[in-house]
Amino acid sequence: MADEKTFRIGFIVLGLFLLALGTFLMSHDRPQVYGTFYAMGSVMVIGGIIWSMCQCYPKITFVPADSDFQGILSPKAMGLLENGLAAEMKSPSPQPPYVRLWEEAAYDQSLPDFSHIQMKVMSYSEDHRSLLAPEMGQPKLGTSDGGEGGPGDVQAWMEAAVVIHKGSDESEGERRLTQSWPGPLACPQGPAPLASFQDDLDMDSSEGSSPNASPHDREEACSPQQEPQGCRCPLDRFQDFALIDAPTLEDEPQEGQQWEIALPNNWQRYPRTKVEEKEASDTGGEEPEKEEEDLYYGLPDGAGDLLPDKELGFEPDTQG
């Protein structure tokens, strides 16, 4: 590399000398001579500069991905690689990749053992408080056999009752509640925090079918059907919900009094007299005609209903 650098510098200096010589010859009026020196000097200077610039960039060596690439490397590089690998293989690592320390082993031993947990399936009717009572031969928590606290206190025996309610057990419990508490006493007393309204569609359809029903008949028709003896409201699961239209204790029927059954489409009413039926038939025929007239706007179609000319406010055109 040093020899090449010296040669490049000498090549550039020689080109500059030829340019200076051509300039000197040009002053003596000899154009056929100084032109040759000028051309040779310019080529040598430009070539030397380009050559030097190309040497500034690092050389790239392409190594094929083959097992024979070791022959391309120099013996010095191969020796360095072998020495480094041998040193790594001979010197043991200061710490193995995974070492189980004694602190971790002690922590694993200090964890509680859950092998003493027992499972007992009980039905809904059985008393779960018996599980909470300690047995006679069971040692108390916090005391060992010697009467003093020791390492045995960490894994002392404990019992806890875990009650899981299943669907079958709930159905059995509901049946027992309905059998043991008949009548309206099973319903929770007091106002419910949540309430829901019944659908008003049934009310609209009922008004359309019987437009002449009296308010007394409507109140009786809206009252729900009297349920047989038993719980009228849902069980404890739905005690927070209640219907606003449900009858209260004051509205409950007395003994010997019958309520009408409220149906969604056909409303039942008490038997009316012949006079009431006749009035209902007369008014029932007139109301549809009035409703049809209300549907139209403007002047009616009949010739007799037209307004007279005096009320219209203008005179008819008499010009012929």
From Swiss-Prot:
One example of a Gene Ontology biological process annotation? sensory perception of sound
- Among the entry's GO cellular component annotations, what is one? protein-containing complex
Q: Where does it localize?
A: Basolateral cell membrane
What membrane topology is annotated for this entry? Multi-pass membrane protein
> Which tissue types show expression of this protein?
Expressed primarily in kidney. Expressed in specific nephron segments and in the stria vascularis of the inner ear.
Side of membrane Cytoplasmic, spans = 1-5, 54-320
Annotated region (Regulates channel membrane trafficking and ion conductance) at 1-72
The Phosphoserine modification is found at 110, 168
Locations of Acidic residues compositional bias?
Answer: 284-295
Q: Specify the superkingdom.
A: Eukaryota
Q: What is the effect of changing residue 8 to L?
A: In BARTS4A; fails to activate CLCNKA and CLCNKB channels
- TM spans, by residue? 6-26, 33-53
Q: Pfam families, per this entry?
A: Barttin
Q: Which keywords annotate this record?
A: Bartter syndrome, Cell membrane, Deafness, Disease variant, Lipoprotein, Membrane, Palmitate, Phosphoprotein, Transmembrane, Transmembrane helix
**Carries keyword Magnesium?**
no
Report residue spans for region: Disordered: 167-233, 250-320
Please give the sites of covalent lipid attachment annotated as S-palmitoyl cysteine. 54, 56
Q: Which residues lie on this side of the membrane: Extracellular?
A: 27-32
Q: How does it assemble?
A: Interacts with CLCNK channels. Forms heteromers with CLCNKA in the thin ascending limb of Henle and with CLCNKB in the thick ascending limb and more distal segments.
Question: Which pathological condition is tied to this protein?
Answer: Bartter syndrome 4A, neonatal, with sensorineural deafness: A form of Bartter syndrome, an autosomal recessive disorder characterized by impaired salt reabsorption in the thick ascending loop of Henle with pronounced salt wasting, hypokalemic metabolic alkalosis, and varying degrees of hypercalciuria. BARTS4A is associated with sensorineural deafness.
State what this protein does: Regulatory subunit of anion-selective CLCNKA:BSND and CLCNKB:BSND heteromeric channels involved in basolateral chloride conductance along the nephron to achieve urine concentration and maintain systemic acid-base homeostasis, and in the stria vascularis of the inner ear to establish the endocochlear potential necessary for normal hearing. Most likely acts as a chaperone that allosterically regulates proper sorting of CLCNKA:BSND and CLCNKB:BSND channels at the basolateral plasma membrane domain and functional switch to ion conducting state.
Q: Could you identify this protein by its name?
A: Barttin
**Encoded by which gene?**
BSND
